[in-house]
Amino acid sequence: MEFTVQQIAEVLGGTVEGDATARISHLAKIEEAQAGALSFLANIKYEPYLYTTGATVVIVSQDFAPRQPVAAALIRVADPYLSFSKLLEFYQRTTRTGKRGVEQPCYQADSAQVGGGGYRGAFSYIGEDCVIGQNVLIFPQAYIGDRCRIGDGTIVYAGARLYPDTVVGQRCVIHAGAVLGADGFGFAPQPDGSYQPIPQIGNVVLEDNVSIGANATIDCATLGSTIIREGSKIDNLVQLAHNVEVGRHTVIASQTGIAGSAKIGDYCVLAGQVGMAGHVSLANKTTVTAQSGVGKTVKQEGLILQGSTAFDFKQNQRAQIVFRRLPELEERLRAVEAAVSAPEKP
Protein backbone atom coordinates (compact mmCIF):
# COMPACT_ATOMS: atom_id res chain seq x y z
CA MET A 1 0.00 0.00 0.00
CA GLU A 2 1.44 3.35 -1.05
CA PHE A 3 0.54 6.97 -0.34
CA THR A 4 1.89 10.27 -1.60
CA VAL A 5 3.56 12.75 0.72
CA GLN A 6 0.63 15.12 0.15
CA GLN A 7 -1.89 12.46 1.18
CA ILE A 8 0.01 11.83 4.42
CA ALA A 9 0.20 15.57 5.11
CA GLU A 10 -3.56 15.93 4.66
CA VAL A 11 -4.22 13.09 7.10
CA LEU A 12 -1.96 14.74 9.69
CA GLY A 13 -3.06 18.31 9.02
CA GLY A 14 0.51 19.27 8.13
CA THR A 15 2.24 21.28 5.41
CA VAL A 16 4.73 19.91 2.86
CA GLU A 17 8.17 21.23 1.98
CA GLY A 18 9.69 19.40 -0.98
CA ASP A 19 8.25 16.85 -3.39
CA ALA A 20 4.60 16.37 -2.42
CA THR A 21 4.10 13.73 -5.13
CA ALA A 22 6.77 11.33 -3.84
CA ARG A 23 5.35 7.96 -2.80
CA ILE A 24 5.61 6.34 0.63
CA SER A 25 5.43 2.57 1.13
CA HIS A 26 6.59 2.01 4.72
CA LEU A 27 7.66 3.57 8.04
CA ALA A 28 11.18 3.46 9.48
CA LYS A 29 13.53 4.93 12.08
CA ILE A 30 15.30 8.03 10.82
CA GLU A 31 18.77 6.50 11.22
CA GLU A 32 17.83 3.39 9.21
CA ALA A 33 15.32 4.69 6.66
CA GLN A 34 15.77 4.17 2.93
CA ALA A 35 13.92 5.38 -0.17
CA GLY A 36 10.16 5.04 0.11
CA ALA A 37 10.21 5.35 3.90
CA LEU A 38 8.54 7.89 6.14
CA SER A 39 10.21 8.81 9.43
CA PHE A 40 9.99 11.54 12.07
CA LEU A 41 12.19 13.85 14.13
CA ALA A 42 10.88 14.59 17.62
CA ASN A 43 14.04 14.42 19.75
CA ILE A 44 16.61 17.03 18.73
CA LYS A 45 19.54 14.70 19.51
CA TYR A 46 18.57 12.76 16.37
CA GLU A 47 18.85 15.87 14.19
CA PRO A 48 22.19 14.81 12.60
CA TYR A 49 20.41 11.82 11.05
CA LEU A 50 18.07 14.19 9.21
CA TYR A 51 20.93 15.28 6.96
CA THR A 52 22.03 11.72 6.12
CA THR A 53 18.79 9.73 6.15
CA GLY A 54 17.59 7.93 3.06
CA ALA A 55 13.95 8.53 4.00
CA THR A 56 11.71 10.04 1.34
CA VAL A 57 9.88 12.21 3.87
CA VAL A 58 10.41 13.18 7.52
CA ILE A 59 7.82 14.61 9.90
CA VAL A 60 9.17 17.62 11.83
CA SER A 61 7.75 20.31 14.08
CA GLN A 62 6.34 23.51 12.65
CA ASP A 63 9.15 25.64 14.05
CA PHE A 64 12.09 23.35 13.23
CA ALA A 65 14.87 25.14 11.31
CA PRO A 66 17.36 22.83 9.52
CA ARG A 67 21.01 23.82 9.87
CA GLN A 68 22.08 21.95 6.73
CA PRO A 69 20.46 21.01 3.41
CA VAL A 70 17.86 18.22 3.69
CA ALA A 71 17.29 15.80 0.81
CA ALA A 72 14.04 14.41 2.18
CA ALA A 73 10.71 16.15 1.90
CA LEU A 74 9.42 17.56 5.18
CA ILE A 75 5.93 17.48 6.65
CA ARG A 76 5.56 20.16 9.31
CA VAL A 77 3.11 19.43 12.14
CA ALA A 78 2.42 20.70 15.66
CA ASP A 79 3.64 17.50 17.36
CA PRO A 80 5.85 15.12 15.31
CA TYR A 81 5.76 12.30 17.85
CA LEU A 82 1.98 12.34 18.15
CA SER A 83 1.57 12.53 14.38
CA PHE A 84 3.90 9.59 13.83
CA SER A 85 2.05 7.57 16.45
CA LYS A 86 -1.18 8.18 14.52
CA LEU A 87 0.47 6.79 11.41
CA LEU A 88 1.69 3.74 13.33
CA GLU A 89 -1.86 3.18 14.53
CA PHE A 90 -3.15 3.42 10.96
CA TYR A 91 -0.44 1.03 9.73
CA GLN A 92 -1.28 -1.49 12.42
CA ARG A 93 -4.97 -1.24 11.68
CA THR A 94 -4.46 -1.91 7.96
CA THR A 95 -1.90 -4.72 8.34
CA ARG A 96 -2.03 -6.64 11.63
CA THR A 97 -5.69 -6.06 12.36
CA GLY A 98 -7.08 -6.13 8.84
CA LYS A 99 -8.44 -9.67 9.22
CA ARG A 100 -12.13 -10.35 8.62
CA GLY A 101 -14.39 -13.38 8.50
CA VAL A 102 -14.53 -16.69 10.35
CA GLU A 103 -11.84 -19.37 10.34
CA GLN A 104 -12.74 -22.98 11.02
CA PRO A 105 -12.82 -24.77 13.30
CA CYS A 106 -14.14 -22.34 15.90
CA TYR A 107 -17.05 -22.48 18.34
CA GLN A 108 -19.90 -20.05 18.90
CA ALA A 109 -22.80 -20.93 21.19
CA ASP A 110 -26.24 -20.72 19.58
CA SER A 111 -27.33 -18.14 22.16
CA ALA A 112 -24.35 -15.84 21.48
CA GLN A 113 -24.92 -12.63 19.52
CA VAL A 114 -21.98 -11.59 17.33
CA GLY A 115 -21.97 -8.35 15.34
CA GLY A 116 -20.80 -8.05 11.76
CA GLY A 117 -17.54 -6.90 10.25
CA GLY A 118 -15.33 -8.80 12.68
CA TYR A 119 -12.96 -11.74 12.72
CA ARG A 120 -12.91 -15.04 14.58
CA GLY A 121 -9.72 -17.06 14.38
CA ALA A 122 -9.41 -20.82 14.34
CA PHE A 123 -10.09 -22.62 17.64
CA SER A 124 -11.57 -19.51 19.26
CA TYR A 125 -14.51 -20.06 21.64
CA ILE A 126 -17.54 -17.87 22.31
CA GLY A 127 -19.79 -19.08 25.13
CA GLU A 128 -23.49 -18.97 25.91
CA ASP A 129 -25.36 -15.64 25.94
CA CYS A 130 -22.33 -13.58 24.92
CA VAL A 131 -22.91 -10.26 23.16
CA ILE A 132 -20.09 -9.29 20.79
CA GLY A 133 -20.20 -5.90 19.06
CA GLN A 134 -19.39 -4.77 15.54
CA ASN A 135 -15.87 -5.12 14.07
CA VAL A 136 -14.53 -7.15 16.99
CA LEU A 137 -11.41 -9.18 16.20
CA ILE A 138 -11.01 -12.44 18.14
CA PHE A 139 -7.75 -14.18 17.28
CA PRO A 140 -7.06 -17.95 17.34
CA GLN A 141 -7.45 -19.88 20.60
CA ALA A 142 -9.02 -16.96 22.45
CA TYR A 143 -11.65 -17.96 25.02
CA ILE A 144 -14.74 -15.83 25.62
CA GLY A 145 -16.71 -17.30 28.53
CA ASP A 146 -20.46 -17.35 29.01
CA ARG A 147 -22.33 -14.04 29.30
CA CYS A 148 -19.36 -11.88 28.33
CA ARG A 149 -19.97 -8.48 26.72
CA ILE A 150 -17.47 -7.00 24.23
CA GLY A 151 -17.93 -3.55 22.68
CA ASP A 152 -17.41 -2.45 19.09
CA GLY A 153 -13.92 -2.39 17.63
CA THR A 154 -12.22 -4.34 20.42
CA ILE A 155 -9.34 -6.73 19.68
CA VAL A 156 -8.78 -9.96 21.64
CA TYR A 157 -5.44 -11.45 20.66
CA ALA A 158 -4.48 -15.12 20.50
CA GLY A 159 -4.78 -17.15 23.67
CA ALA A 160 -6.41 -14.45 25.79
CA ARG A 161 -8.97 -15.71 28.33
CA LEU A 162 -12.13 -13.87 29.36
CA TYR A 163 -13.88 -15.69 32.18
CA PRO A 164 -17.70 -15.67 32.32
CA ASP A 165 -19.46 -12.32 32.88
CA THR A 166 -16.46 -10.20 31.87
CA VAL A 167 -17.49 -6.84 30.37
CA VAL A 168 -15.21 -5.13 27.84
CA GLY A 169 -15.92 -1.71 26.37
CA GLN A 170 -15.36 -0.33 22.89
CA ARG A 171 -11.97 -0.14 21.16
CA CYS A 172 -10.15 -2.08 23.85
CA VAL A 173 -7.07 -4.22 23.18
CA ILE A 174 -6.45 -7.44 25.11
CA HIS A 175 -3.08 -8.93 24.25
CA ALA A 176 -2.04 -12.57 24.00
CA GLY A 177 -2.19 -14.64 27.16
CA ALA A 178 -4.02 -12.07 29.27
CA VAL A 179 -6.51 -13.54 31.75
CA LEU A 180 -9.53 -11.50 32.84
CA GLY A 181 -11.83 -12.77 35.56
CA ALA A 182 -9.96 -15.60 37.28
CA ASP A 183 -10.77 -16.09 40.97
CA GLY A 184 -9.43 -13.49 43.33
CA PHE A 185 -6.94 -14.63 45.97
CA GLY A 186 -9.50 -15.06 48.73
CA PHE A 187 -9.07 -17.70 51.44
CA ALA A 188 -10.38 -17.79 55.02
CA PRO A 189 -7.97 -19.24 57.62
CA GLN A 190 -9.38 -22.19 59.57
CA PRO A 191 -8.69 -23.19 63.22
CA ASP A 192 -6.52 -26.09 62.04
CA GLY A 193 -4.29 -23.76 60.00
CA SER A 194 -5.79 -24.66 56.63
CA TYR A 195 -7.51 -22.22 54.29
CA GLN A 196 -11.10 -22.29 53.06
CA PRO A 197 -11.61 -20.79 49.57
CA ILE A 198 -13.95 -17.79 49.51
CA PRO A 199 -16.16 -17.92 46.39
CA GLN A 200 -15.43 -15.04 44.04
CA ILE A 201 -18.72 -14.29 42.29
CA GLY A 202 -18.07 -10.81 40.87
CA ASN A 203 -16.64 -9.92 37.48
CA VAL A 204 -14.14 -7.73 35.62
CA VAL A 205 -15.17 -4.55 33.78
CA LEU A 206 -13.02 -2.71 31.24
CA GLU A 207 -14.37 0.64 30.10
CA ASP A 208 -13.70 2.03 26.60
CA ASN A 209 -10.19 2.36 25.12
CA VAL A 210 -8.45 0.20 27.72
CA SER A 211 -5.33 -1.77 26.78
CA ILE A 212 -4.30 -4.95 28.62
CA GLY A 213 -0.76 -6.26 28.03
CA ALA A 214 0.36 -9.79 27.30
CA ASN A 215 0.09 -12.23 30.20
CA ALA A 216 -1.46 -9.62 32.48
CA THR A 217 -3.94 -11.01 35.00
CA ILE A 218 -6.99 -9.22 36.36
CA ASP A 219 -8.97 -11.13 38.98
CA CYS A 220 -12.73 -10.97 39.32
CA ALA A 221 -14.26 -9.27 42.33
CA THR A 222 -15.44 -11.17 45.37
CA LEU A 223 -18.67 -9.17 45.01
CA GLY A 224 -19.28 -6.42 42.49
CA SER A 225 -16.61 -5.64 39.90
CA THR A 226 -12.90 -5.20 39.43
CA ILE A 227 -12.87 -2.06 37.25
CA ILE A 228 -10.38 -0.56 34.80
CA ARG A 229 -11.74 2.82 33.76
CA GLU A 230 -11.66 4.58 30.41
CA GLY A 231 -8.36 4.98 28.58
CA SER A 232 -6.12 3.20 31.08
CA LYS A 233 -3.19 1.10 29.88
CA ILE A 234 -1.97 -2.01 31.69
CA ASP A 235 1.43 -3.41 30.69
CA ASN A 236 2.56 -7.03 30.32
CA LEU A 237 2.78 -9.19 33.45
CA VAL A 238 0.75 -6.90 35.70
CA GLN A 239 -1.39 -8.47 38.45
CA LEU A 240 -4.56 -6.71 39.61
CA ALA A 241 -6.32 -8.48 42.47
CA HIS A 242 -10.02 -8.76 43.25
CA ASN A 243 -12.05 -5.54 43.58
CA VAL A 244 -9.21 -3.28 42.46
CA GLU A 245 -10.33 -0.05 40.79
CA VAL A 246 -8.07 1.77 38.32
CA GLY A 247 -9.05 5.31 37.36
CA ARG A 248 -9.24 6.96 33.96
CA HIS A 249 -6.13 7.30 31.76
CA THR A 250 -3.83 5.67 34.29
CA VAL A 251 -0.78 3.69 33.11
CA ILE A 252 0.69 0.72 35.00
CA ALA A 253 4.05 -0.74 33.90
CA SER A 254 5.22 -4.33 33.87
CA GLN A 255 5.54 -6.59 36.92
CA THR A 256 3.46 -4.31 39.12
CA GLY A 257 1.21 -6.02 41.64
CA ILE A 258 -1.89 -4.39 43.15
CA ALA A 259 -3.50 -6.12 46.13
CA GLY A 260 -7.22 -6.55 46.70
CA SER A 261 -9.61 -3.59 46.93
CA ALA A 262 -6.89 -1.02 46.25
CA LYS A 263 -8.09 2.08 44.41
CA ILE A 264 -5.93 4.04 41.97
CA GLY A 265 -7.03 7.49 40.82
CA ASP A 266 -7.20 9.13 37.40
CA TYR A 267 -4.07 10.04 35.40
CA CYS A 268 -1.73 8.09 37.67
CA VAL A 269 1.58 6.52 36.59
CA LEU A 270 2.87 3.33 38.24
CA ALA A 271 6.33 2.37 36.98
CA GLY A 272 7.71 -1.16 36.81
CA GLN A 273 7.66 -3.54 39.79
CA VAL A 274 5.55 -1.30 41.99
CA GLY A 275 3.76 -3.04 44.84
CA MET A 276 0.57 -1.67 46.36
CA ALA A 277 -1.08 -2.99 49.51
CA GLY A 278 -4.73 -3.89 49.68
CA HIS A 279 -7.50 -1.48 50.74
CA VAL A 280 -5.40 1.66 50.17
CA SER A 281 -5.96 4.47 47.67
CA LEU A 282 -3.89 6.74 45.44
CA ALA A 283 -5.07 10.27 44.64
CA ASN A 284 -5.37 11.48 41.06
CA LYS A 285 -2.16 12.26 39.14
CA THR A 286 0.07 10.30 41.52
CA THR A 287 3.34 8.94 40.11
CA VAL A 288 4.99 5.93 41.77
CA THR A 289 8.57 5.27 40.66
CA ALA A 290 9.97 1.82 39.86
CA GLN A 291 10.22 -0.80 42.62
CA SER A 292 8.41 1.40 45.11
CA GLY A 293 5.95 0.05 47.64
CA VAL A 294 2.73 1.83 48.57
CA GLY A 295 1.47 0.76 51.98
CA LYS A 296 -0.89 3.55 52.95
CA THR A 297 -3.47 5.82 51.36
CA VAL A 298 -2.19 8.91 49.54
CA LYS A 299 -4.76 11.73 49.59
CA GLN A 300 -2.78 14.61 48.07
CA GLU A 301 -2.94 14.84 44.28
CA GLY A 302 0.11 15.06 42.05
CA LEU A 303 2.73 13.57 44.36
CA ILE A 304 5.73 11.60 43.09
CA LEU A 305 6.37 8.64 45.40
CA GLN A 306 9.60 6.72 45.70
CA GLY A 307 10.97 4.03 47.97
CA SER A 308 9.67 1.07 49.88
CA THR A 309 7.47 1.93 51.64
CA ALA A 310 6.99 4.80 49.22
CA PHE A 311 6.87 8.37 50.47
CA ASP A 312 7.33 11.86 49.05
CA PHE A 313 9.88 11.95 46.23
CA LYS A 314 11.89 14.94 47.51
CA GLN A 315 11.99 13.61 51.06
CA ASN A 316 13.17 10.27 49.74
CA GLN A 317 15.94 11.93 47.73
CA ARG A 318 17.19 13.74 50.84
CA ALA A 319 17.03 10.51 52.81
CA GLN A 320 19.07 8.73 50.13
CA ILE A 321 21.77 11.41 50.37
CA VAL A 322 21.97 10.92 54.13
CA PHE A 323 21.97 7.14 53.67
CA ARG A 324 25.00 7.28 51.37
CA ARG A 325 26.86 9.39 53.96
CA LEU A 326 26.13 7.08 56.89
CA PRO A 327 29.67 5.56 57.09
CA GLU A 328 31.20 9.05 57.20
CA LEU A 329 28.63 10.26 59.73
CA GLU A 330 29.27 7.18 61.89
CA GLU A 331 33.01 7.93 61.98
CA ARG A 332 32.35 11.52 62.97
CA LEU A 333 29.89 10.44 65.65
CA ARG A 334 32.41 8.01 67.11
CA ALA A 335 35.04 10.76 67.16
CA VAL A 336 32.64 13.09 68.97
CA GLU A 337 31.71 10.37 71.48
CA ALA A 338 35.39 9.62 72.10
CA ALA A 339 36.15 13.28 72.67
CA VAL A 340 33.22 13.70 75.06
CA SER A 341 34.07 10.60 77.08
CA ALA A 342 37.81 11.28 77.28
CA PRO A 343 38.96 12.46 80.77
CA GLU A 344 39.88 16.11 81.01
CA LYS A 345 43.58 16.88 81.27
CA PRO A 346 44.61 18.52 84.56
Language model region names:
Residues 1-105, 171, 177-178, 183-196, ...:
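Terminal amphipathic alpha-helical/low-complexity segments used for targeting or macromolecular assembly
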Residues 40, 101-312:
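Structural signal for interior beta-strand "rungs" in well-ordered beta-sheet cores
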